[in-house]
Amino acid sequence: MIKVTLRSLADKWPSDIVARTEVKAFTGGTVSEKYMANLDSQGAGPNGRFKIGRKVAYPINELVEWLERRTVSLDE
């Protein structure tokens, strides 16, 4: 099994947090804001989410680790 590393996403992001509304941009369009909201409501989203005003955000390291756990290589 090939391990997929997404750490480069965090290295290129200009902040230590990612707003839920920016997850689509952060993941290159592979994960949408609505999908994240649905997973969060089921308790299946990344750990450590928090709110700033009306916006939900994720610590970047938690988001990357969560994405890596959910990622499967198709080149096996």
Give short role names for the model-derived ranges.
Residues 2-38, 68-69:
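Polyanion-binding surface elements
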Residues 22, 62-63:
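Short, well-ordered alpha-helical scaffold segment located
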Residues 65-76:
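DNA/chromatin major-groove-contacting recognition/catalytic segments
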Residues 3, 26-60, 73-75:
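Major-groove DNA-recognition helix of helix-turn-helix-type DNA-binding domains
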